[in-house]
């Protein structure tokens, strides 16, 4: 059986374990956390299903066939902001395979390099002389912020349908910050260890990156009372 296979290669599943000097079963440990998971809801935003209805997001890791509420993109982002501004945090699931995701540099960005109209005068003059590859090399030095893609529902959908946006990783959104240009970022707690970057395991994901690369978010239901 599958259980026998796991027992052979991973060891027998313990019925009890000790944490901080106290013995638990999996169920008693879950109960000790004080979380009622019925108070949490999963939200997503895609155009190939009707808004304001539930559907199964078509990603390999959704093996439980979980259904998520489909909201317009701006409303999904609004819910995340409301949660973070009102004492809640947000569970985030999304794509971390892009070069713009740099845990080492503590940032995740979605740079706009095809159009240079929004660049400052100095950067625009330099970037107009570069091809797209050279522009990306400059941006991915992560030395300063550059303009980012305006992510519409259509842009987001194209990334999902082309498998450019995939179901890679889950992290914890804990706050909101802005850079010197006023660009919004989501303060994000990663699970890859506190020693692997100089930010204690955190990074800042830009608004454009989150709009483009989110598969779904999970929030407390009270994060939706305003809509």
Identify what each model region corresponds to.
Residues 1-91, 96, 100-105:
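Core regions of eukaryotic protease modules
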Residues 69-168:
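Long, positively charged binding patches that form subdomain-scale interaction surfaces
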Residues 97-99, 178, 192-193, 210:
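Short, glycine-/Ser/Thr-/acidic-enriched flexible segments
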Residues 161, 166-193:
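Catalytic nucleophile-His microenvironment captured as a short glycine-rich beta-strand/loop
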Residues 195-206:
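A short macromolecule-binding patch
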Residues 203-205, 213-220:
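Long, low-charge, small-residue-enriched segments that form tightly packed helices used
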Residues 225-227:
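Conserved small/polar residues in nucleotide/adenosyl-binding loops
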């Amino acid at each position: 059986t599958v259980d026998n296979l796991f027992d052979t290669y991973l060891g027998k599943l313990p019925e009890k374990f000790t944490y901080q000097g106290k013995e638990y079963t999996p169920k008693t440990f879950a109960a000790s956390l004080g979380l009622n998971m019925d108070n949490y809801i999963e939200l997503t935003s895609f155009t190939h299903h009707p808004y304001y209805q539930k559907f199964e997001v078509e990603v390999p890791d959704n093996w439980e066939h979980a259904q998520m509420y489909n909201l317009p993109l701006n409303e999904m982002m609004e819910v995340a902001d409301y949660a973070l501004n009102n004492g809640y945090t947000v569970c985030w699931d999304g794509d971390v395979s892009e070069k713009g995701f740099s845990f080492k540099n503590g940032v995740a960005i979605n740079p706009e390099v095809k159009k240079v109209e929004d660049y400052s005068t100095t950067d625009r003059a330099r970037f107009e002389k570069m091809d797209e590859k050279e522009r990306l090399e400059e941006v991915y030095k992560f030395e300063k912020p550059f303009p980012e893609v305006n992510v519409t529902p259509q842009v987001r959908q194209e990334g999902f349908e082309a498998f450019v946006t995939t179901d890679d990783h889950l992290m914890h959104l804990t706050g909101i910050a802005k850079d010197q240009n006023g660009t919004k970022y989501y303060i994000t707690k990663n699970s890859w260890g506190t020693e692997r970057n100089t930010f204690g395991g955190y990074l800042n994901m830009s608004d454009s990156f989150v709009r483009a690369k989110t598969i779904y978010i999970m929030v407390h239901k009270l994060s939706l009372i305003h809509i």
